[in-house]
């Protein structure tokens, strides 16, 4: 008997270095280890006919859509909706699906239609589950919670501090994120200029691809004018991320919307303090569960001065940085591992296909 065939649709996949790509690769590696035949297909720029051809060739037993609006919307096209409407579908909506797209009419309609097709819906945070009550209240019986994990994809060496020309005594903030408005890259850069003026030893490194042409061009020009303290470098190879985190002092997230940030989870696992925008998706990575010590500091994204205050707090207090980083590393050691996450995914897949086939997924054959 052939292995269970799983097709994961995601907006981007390796070699692109994005949160979606890293999540899909983490899943792929662990699910393959459990005996599944997994194919990851990026949907950005993919024509409906090409996806239809891939489905015909691969003949998946189930399709997992990661990001309802950007990846799942393709399945609503007539060429696919009519011919593959009975293919079991699992959807893991993104933070943007739940917090941005679902609040505008066009996006809300697309997200709702994709979720209505799903045999199962995966959330990876309690905040995500609560948000789904608003946008998929009639489908809550199909919502499954699968705790998120992380994995280091290699041990390549990369000293960001040295490669960017910063000194050992500088306090370096690191913001790995694609350059687009929802990530707040430009806003963090402009706010950090005030930090630098008040604390000349503060530095910041942005790493990520251009995901919005106009915004990225504006960002590029602003960075070029601030080379005294800021750098924008290309995406870092996944195999070097652990080393990159280890060479800086603070991990920064300035997003207006997040589901559950890979960067914040990885940053705290690397033992680094977090500075993050105070939005629902960022609170658990920073504060953990009730009774846990904080692992970072939140700032009000609507108040530029609050960003400056919180950043300066971390620049000035090395003991605080160490305490927050140690708390994050300790919490990460208690988190589910990637194989635990994969087992949770398999349980959801079995629930999705079991309604009609009553079969097991992992280790089939």
Predicted regions and their residues:
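Aromatic "clamp/platform" in nucleotide-sugar-dependent glycosyltransferases that forms part
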Residues: 256
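Short hydrophobic beta-strand element within catalytic cores of glycosyltransferases
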Residues: 273-276, 280-283
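Glycosyltransferase donor-sugar binding loop
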Residues: 176, 203-217, 234
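Conserved donor-binding/catalytic core segment of Leloir-type glycosyltransferases
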Residues: 166-193, 205-207
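Nucleotide-activated donor-binding/catalytic signature segment of Leloir-type glycosyltransferases, i.e.
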Residues: 217-236
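Short alpha-helical donor nucleotide-sugar binding micro-motif in glycosyltransferases
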Residues: 235-236, 243-248
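Conserved acidic donor-binding segment of nucleotide-sugar-dependent glycosyltransferases
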Residues: 288, 292-304, 313-318
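A short, active-site helix/loop in glycosyltransferases that binds the activated sugar's phosphate group
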Residues: 116-141, 150-154
